[in-house]
Amino acid sequence: MPPKFDPNEVKTIFMRAVGGEVAGGSTLAPKIGPLGLSPKKVGEDIAKATKDWKGLRVTVKLTIQNRQAAVSVVPSASALVIKALKEPARDRKKDKNVAHSGNVSLDEIIEVARTMRFKSLAKELSGTVKEILGTAFSVGCTVDGKNPHDVQKEIDNGEIEIPQE
């Protein structure tokens, strides 16, 4: 006999989804089917919650309590950097492995670092900014027209001041 259903129990599920697209029922069913939820309905909720992240892969946090699913987006550093590039949404099925050759201002990088501060292991905001600069390098964009590695060196040498918080 299966265990009794506890209405106060909260289950949390993290999964990757493409922003603005309805996740396939086949990928959701094994995770949320046993919890008594409709995979199709949860897929539509995920698509609604991620419409701001169209075409980008983001982590979605499903909080399930009393057979109700609450969807929240947990963006990755790369998704935030790509969003800061303000590139138009592209067709995911046609374009694969696209290099993002745009330019991001240092202020936007600092904003992304503030958003990602809770995930960072750095002691100060400048360390988090350097983490995000590393992500910007791997995404392939420039920061204020310079290579992100050069900006990191300038922060280390004290040429660029990063606010404390």
From Swiss-Prot:
| Gene Ontology terms describing biological process | cytoplasmic translation; cytosolic large ribosomal subunit assembly; translation
Q: Which UniProt keywords apply?
A: Cytoplasm, Methylation, Nucleus, Ribonucleoprotein, Ribosomal protein, RNA-binding
Please report the organism this UniProt entry assigns to the protein: Schizosaccharomyces pombe (strain 972 / ATCC 24843) (Fission yeast)
Give the PROSITE patterns listed for this entry: RIBOSOMAL_L11 (PS00359)
Name of the protein: Large ribosomal subunit protein uL11A
Tell me what else is known.
Answer: There are 2 genes for uL11 in S.pombe.
Q: Name one GO cellular component term.
A: nucleolus
Gene encoding it?
rpl1201
What is known about what this protein does? This protein binds directly to 26S ribosomal RNA. Component of the ribosome, a large ribonucleoprotein complex responsible for the synthesis of proteins in the cell. The small ribosomal subunit (SSU) binds messenger RNAs (mRNAs) and translates the encoded message by selecting cognate aminoacyl-transfer RNA (tRNA) molecules. The large subunit (LSU) contains the ribosomal catalytic site termed the peptidyl transferase center (PTC), which catalyzes the formation of peptide bonds, thereby polymerizing the amino acids delivered by tRNAs into a polypeptide chain.
Subcellular compartments: Cytoplasm; Nucleus, Nucleolus
Parts of the chain that traverse the membrane: none
What InterPro entries does the entry give? Ribosomal_uL11, Ribosomal_uL11_C, Ribosomal_uL11_C_sf, Ribosomal_uL11_CS, Ribosomal_uL11_N, Ribosomal_uL11_N_sf
Quaternary structure, from the entry:
Component of the large ribosomal subunit (LSU). Mature yeast ribosomes consist of a small (40S) and a large (60S) subunit. The 40S small subunit contains 1 molecule of ribosomal RNA (18S rRNA) and at least 33 different proteins. The large 60S subunit contains 3 rRNA molecules (25S, 5.8S and 5S rRNA) and at least 46 different proteins.
